[in-house]
Every structure is written in C-alpha cells, then in structure tokens.
Amino acid sequence: MEKLFIEGGRPLHGSVKISGAKNAALPLMAATLLAPGKHILRNVPELRDTKTLLQVMAELGVTSQRDGDVLTIDSTHLKHCEASYDLVRTMRASVLVLGPLVARLGQARVSKPGGCAIGDRPINLHLMGLETLGAKCIQEHGYVDVEVDGRLQGGTIYFDVPSVTGTENLLMAATLAEGTTVLQNAAREPEIANLVDMLVGMGARIEGRDSDELTIHGVEQLGQADCVIIPDRIEAGTYLIAIAASGGAGKVTHCQPEHLSALLTKLRATGLLLEADESTISISFPEGKTVSDLSCVDIKTMPYPGYATDLQAQFMALMCLATGSSVVNETIFENRFMHVAELERMNADIKINGGSAVVTGNGVAGLVGAPVMATDLRASSSLVIAGLAATGQTEVRRIYHLERGYEKLEEKLTGLGARVWKEQS
C-alpha cells in the first residue's frame, strides 16, 4: 500500500490547473445509460471513482474509451441491469445507475451501498421517489430491486432535505417518464446544473435550472450527448487553502469562481487577499503578514450555495495555523470530524462537542509532522494541507482516499514547489 510523504515548511508558489469535477463526472457518466449511442464527455478527471463507475457500467454491457480528458461511452448494447456488491461497496455514487436503468430498461438490481465513513446516507429518498413515479421497490438480501410496468409515470416528489444524489437519480429517471415530474426542495449544486445541461442537450425537457424546484416533462427517447464537465470547485478550494496554509501565494486556473463564493468570503475574512476573474483565482498575504496573523473565522456547512461540507476539513486545518479560536459547525453529515484525531497527532488543539468543533490555533509553529491515516476523501486532503504547513515530515497512509477525488495530486503539488513523494509500504 502506498504512503504519501510531505516535507513541511515550504511555501507554495505558482499556478495550478483545476481538473473536471468528480461530482459532476459521475452523474453525467451515469446519464449516458439513458440513451443508446456513443456519448462524448469532455474534461473528465481520471480518478479512482471514475474508473470504478466505468467498471460498473462495463458489467451492464457498456463500453468506453478514453483519449486524454475525453471519454467516449457507448451504451448501445446496454443489456444487464445489475450493479454488483463488489463494485458498489467501493463507491456509494454507483447508486446513480439506478434511475437511468429503470427509466430505460424498466428494471434495475443494485447492491445497497452500505455504511459510509462520514455518516449515514441512506438511499430511501431515491426509492421513495421512484415509487412515486410508479416503480415497485424491494429491498432484500443486500440488494435493491426496482421494476416498472411500461414507462415511469410523472409525479411530484418533495425532498425533506436537499439530496444531491437523490435529485440527480430522480432527475435522470424522470426524463423518460410519461407526463410531468416536479422535484421540490431539490439540491441546487452546480454539478446538478451541469447534469441538466447535458440532459437538455440530449433532448430532455427540463425547467428550473439552478433552482430548488425542477420540472421535467418526460419524452419518449433521448439522443446522444456531447458535454463538458465543469471544473472541480472542491479541488480548487483545496488548493487555495493549501497555498494559504503553506504561507505562499499563487493562483488556481480553469475554475469557476462563482461556485466558490462562500469559501472566498471566509478566506477574505481571515485577512487573505483574493482576486478572481472569469476562470482564475489568485490568493496571497498582505505585505508583511504570515499565516500566524490570520484572523480566526467560524464556518457552518450548508447545502449549496452555503459553505460546502466537502471543504470543512481543509478549512479546519487552516484554522489550526491561525492564532486564537474558531468554531466549525457541521450540519450536513453527523460523523465528519474523523480527521480531528489525526490532526491532533500533529499537535492540533481541537475540541468536539456534537456537531461543532472548537479549533484553537497556535500559529504557524503549532503543527508538527507525524504519521497520520486518511479516513475519507476530504479528511485526507486536510492532512495533506496540515503536512505542508507543519514542521518536519508527515506520512499520510491510506492515500487511496486521495486518489478517489484528486487528479495528479503529487504532480500538482510538486509544480507549486512542495516536497512530496510516494513510497510503497
């Protein structure tokens, strides 16, 4: 198993190009199951998660070919409807094939994803929505079996809480339903807007893009897709925080700053200088200021356009380097402080109280390198950020979590001047 080693204390400088968004690529890949033909997706990141979903789709009879960041998916010969446990257990997003399979084939058999390191994320919302559209759902022996006689039927679905994958799954299913479907209190993430754009390009009739109410007028069939994946806002935010934590200055390119408004507001509140244009964000310190001079800032995770839960751990690592106390409130997942114990191994001072964590920063000299273990994707990136700022060497284990969501991480950090390398254990 590989480990990532980081030699701390080297300020990052330069620019880093942001890859396509993992959280957009996965639903758009699943959406190609809705229609036969060759579908072209551009700016697709090469990640452990995208590879896993391609394996799931291969089991269904789909073929694919990658040329750089262009992925061609041929779903002409889609014939199987079962997503097996061996693959679904490694990535919860595999459940995104459920809606498209039921809509196109009239049936689907998908392994239940099981538990998740960062909290309970049941698929009940997906199933209740499909039942509203006329499907029969049975859960037994670790699988979900969904069937419908004929076409799905339009209906009104209300989400008690905005669910990103639930919105995506039911949005895809509804495109081929008979009649009109309304999704109320739907999630509003930019990745969902990206999916809407792709589906409309395939011939779907959808109203309400960027809003919490989506109206889908079902059509009998969809055509082939040719769509560009939006930039990864979480990757962009991670690198901005990493540059700040290292005490450096730089910029992220090929991003969409409007998708990061909440983070940029919080970073400016710490005293950092940020400038953004159409596709680039620059970050630096005021003259004569260092990481230790940063103001402590509280954050509260919220559904988009609020502060993203996927950037909570990274911001916490930055606050460990400020001087004073800040509060991190996590409202999306009930168990998303697993990185705290590992940060404490690096001398961080963090106290957890339910869904809140109080971070007492001790300045740039507060963190020291240590062996740490990644527990999930975003927790692992917070450990990398802490390692970049810490005194001495940090060893991050279980880096397969990083490979799920960060394309060419080692190469990109090295390009910014970091001293990072991988070794086999």
Curated annotation (Swiss-Prot):
The active site is at 116 (proton donor). One of its GO terms (cellular component) is cytoplasm. The keyword Cytoplasm applies. Pathway: Cell wall biogenesis; peptidoglycan biosynthesis. It catalyses: phosphoenolpyruvate + UDP-N-acetyl-alpha-D-glucosamine = UDP-N-acetyl-3-O-(1-carboxyvinyl)-alpha-D-glucosamine + phosphate. GO terms for biological process: cell division; cell wall organization; peptidoglycan biosynthetic process; regulation of cell shape; UDP-N-acetylgalactosamine biosynthetic process. Phosphoenolpyruvate binds at residues 22-23. GO terms for molecular function: UDP-N-acetylglucosamine 1-carboxyvinyltransferase activity. InterPro entries: Ankyrin_rpt, Enolpyruvate_Tfrase_dom, Enolpyruvate_Tfrase_sf, MurA_subfamily, RNA3'P_cycl/enolpyr_Trfase_a/b, UDP_GlcNAc_COvinyl_MurA. UDP-N-acetyl-alpha-D-glucosamine binds at residues 92, 310, 332. Pfam families: EPSP_synthase. SUPFAM superfamilies: EPT/RTPC-like (SSF55205). The keyword S-adenosyl-L-methionine does not apply. Cell wall formation. Adds enolpyruvyl to UDP-N-acetylglucosamine. Belongs to the EPSP synthase family. MurA subfamily. This is UDP-N-acetylglucosamine 1-carboxyvinyltransferase. It comes from Desulfotalea psychrophila (strain LSv54 / DSM 12343). The gene is murA.
